[in-house]
Amino acid sequence: MSNIGIDVKAPENVCEDPNCPFHGTLSVRGQIFEGIVTSDKGHDTIVIKREVTGYISKYERYEKRTTSLVAHNPACIKAKVGDTVKVMECRPISKTKSFVVIEKTENLE
């Protein structure tokens, strides 16, 4: 198991995935986001929704928006729908996947 450079709890399971930052050769860098898994139907892929708050100066109010990210789900983490996960930026794995799950924090269901 390799050290990925940030302070997260390493997964207990072991996988043979080459795109796993812990057991494979995928290096992670850049931004870290936290969100809720809304879909896990793709092969080793999850969709994450996260809320973004923005300030509108004309109305002096804040607005909530949701954005979705597509991330790689390694076999050692296996996040499911309803889980809260942390994802980190990596090199592009496919056309839409440029993030990988690094930690599963809790399940809301």
Swiss-Prot record:
Biological processes annotated in GO: translation
UniProt xrefs under Pfam families: Ribosomal_S17
Keywords attached to this entry: Ribonucleoprotein, Ribosomal protein, RNA-binding, rRNA-binding
Xref: PROSITE patterns: RIBOSOMAL_S17
Keyword presence, rRNA-binding: yes
Origin: domain of life: Archaea
Gene Ontology cellular component annotations, sorted alphabetically: cytosolic small ribosomal subunit
Signal peptide: none
Molecular function GO labels: rRNA binding; structural constituent of ribosome
Protein role: One of the primary rRNA binding proteins, it binds specifically to the 5'-end of 16S ribosomal RNA.
Subunit structure and binding partners: Part of the 30S ribosomal subunit.
Family: Belongs to the universal ribosomal protein uS17 family.
Name listed for the protein in its UniProt record: Small ribosomal subunit protein uS17
Lineage, highest ranks first: Archaea, Methanobacteriati, Methanobacteriota, Methanomada group, Methanococci
The encoding gene: rps17
